[in-house]
Amino acid sequence: MSTLTRFSVQPLSTMTRRLADVASARREPDLVIQGARVLSTYSERFLDGREVWISGGRIAAVKPAGSYRGGSAKLYDARGGIIAPGLVDPHIHIESSMVTACAYAEAALLNGTTTIFCDSHEIGNVMDVAGVEAMLEDARQAPLSIFLTVPSTVPATTPDLETAGGDLTPDKIAALFDKWPEAVALGEKMDFVPVAMGDERSHAILAAALGRGRPVSGHVYGREFVAAYAASGVTDTHEAIDRGIADDLLEAGVWIFLRGGPPTTPWHSLPQAIKTITELGASHKRVAVCTDDRDAEDLLAFGLDWVTREAVKYGMRPEEAWAMGSLHGATRFGMEGEIGGLGGGRRADLVLLSDDLTPVSTWYGGKLVVDSKKITPILDEALSKPYRYPDAAYHTVKLPKNLKLTPDLPTETVVAHTIKTELPGITLGHVTVTLEPANDWQAHFDKHDLCFVTVVERHGKSAGNVAHGLLNGFGLRQGAVASSVGHDSHNIIVAGTNAADMQVALDAIEEKQGGVCVVMDGKVTAMVPLPIAGLLSDKRVHQVADEVKALKLEWEKAGCTIAYMGFNLIPLSVIPEIRITDKGLVLVPEMVISPLFEKA
C-alpha cells in the first residue's frame, strides 16, 4: 500500500490493543462518523442508526447511534447518508488512462475507489522490468492503495509476429515477485491458446507465480478453452463476455470480474455476463466488478462506482452490487481482513454515498480526502508532488527517417486482406476485397470504404519495421490519426488517406515522445501528448481529461467509426480475427503473417 506518511496505516498486528481499547470505550477514537446508515458487505444489508469509530486509520467498531458520549474525538455528521467500504477494483491498467499512478489516484478517490489491482503490462511492453518498477515506485508514492499483478504476457505473442520493447521472461517475473511485496498476483495471462496447448514458456511463467503462492489472473475467449485454462491454475478473468462463458468459468472455479464501460468503448460486457446470475441462477459470491481500461475523461465519469450502479441496473440488489465492488475483489486476493468491509481492524477506507450509490465523500486511511465531491487540501498537496519517472522513460520513441508509410498501388488485379472495423472495436473481421487496377488509391477508398493503416516499430530494436494494411469501414475520409499506444507492444499505429498527413501525425508523436493525435490538411488539430514511455502524461487527471475530450471531438469530425481506444487495439495480436503489427498482418486463429495482397 501507499508509503506516503500522511496516509500510512500501521499493521494490525501493532494496533490490536489500541483498537480493543477504543472499541471498549477505554480510549478515545480519533474520529466518529455519526448519523449514518451502514452498508454491510458481510451480511449484504443496510443497517440504520449506526456510527463508525476510527483510530489510527483503522476501524475500531461500528456501533449503534448514540454510543459515543462525547470527548476529544473529531465528529463527522453523515446526515443519514450511507457509509460503505471503499471500492476495490480487481483489474485495471493505469496506463490506459494515460496518467501516472499519482494522477490516477485523484479520479479513483473522487469516485470512491480506495484500492486497485493494476496490471502494468503496457509500460512493461515498452521498458521491460525498468518500466514495471518505475510504475511501482509511482504507485508507492500515490495516495491510493495500489497492488501489482505482475505482467505475464510481455510480449503478447512472439518476436516472429511483433516487436516489443520488453520481454518479461519467467526469471524476470520471479524476481519481481521476490523483490516487491506489492506484487501480489500474476497479471492477465492473455495467451490463452498457448496456455491451453501446453506452451513451455507460458507454463514456466505460471509456475513462477503458483510456486510462490500467488494467484493467477486470466484473459480468455472461447468456451472451448475454459477447462484447460482453469486446469493451468488461472483463477480469475475479466473477459466473461456473455452468460454462457461466465457460467462455464464459475463452474470451473474461476472468479469472474464483470467489466463495465461506456457503451462507446469495447469494455461494456457486464450486461450480458451478469445474466449468469440473473437468468441462470448462479451465485454472485465469486463475482466482482472491474473497469479494466478507461481514458482520463471516462475515468472521471465512469468509475467503478458507475459499474456498481450498472450492476444494480441489470438486476442486483444495491447491497449485493456494492459487495461485488468491494469485498469480493478483496476476497479474491486474500485481503478481506484488511479492506472491503467495515469490520473491526480493517483499514478506514470509507465512502459516504447518496441513496443511489453515488460517492459524496471519501476517507482513505481515516483521512478525509474527498468532501462533498471535492478533493481536500491534504489530498491536493499529495497530488502536487508526483513521482518523477527515470529519464529513460522520456525517450522511448525512436524512429528512423524516410519511412514509407503507404503500400504501392497495385498495377494488376489483386485480392487485399483488409481489417474490418466494427463497433465496439474489440474483435476485427478479416474481409478480402478485390482491387482492380486504378489511377490512384482514392478510387479504391471510395469504392470499398478503405483507408491506409500502418504500424511503425518505435523501440529502436529493428531497422525500422513498417507494416502496411487497409482498414475497411473505419470511416476516415481525409487526414490521419495516430497513436503510440498500439496495444500491446505499443508501436505507433497511424491511419490515413494520404502519406503526407500520416507523416505529420508521425512527426508530432516523435516530437512529443508519444501521444494520440488527429491531423487534417497538414495540421495537428488535436493531440494528447504522452511523454512518459509514450503512454502517460505528466499532468493532473482533469487536464488530461480536457485534452482527451478535445481529441474525441476531432476524432469524430474525422469520421472514425470506432473510438480511439478501439483504434489502439488494432495491433493487439491475441484477439481475433486479423490484426496488424510492425511485422505485418497477423491472422490470429493461425498465428501467422499474411501478405497484404495476393494475386486474384
From Swiss-Prot:
It comes from the Bacteria. Keywords: Hydrolase, Manganese, Plasmid. It catalyses: adenine + H2O + H(+) = hypoxanthine + NH4(+). Pfam families: Adenine_deam_C, Amidohydro_1. GO terms for molecular function: adenine deaminase activity. Its cofactor is Mn(2+). GO terms for biological process: adenine catabolic process. Its EC number is 3.5.4.2. Belongs to the metallo-dependent hydrolases superfamily. Adenine deaminase family. This is Adenine deaminase 3. It comes from Rhizobium johnstonii (strain DSM 114642 / LMG 32736 / 3841) (Rhizobium leguminosarum bv. viciae).
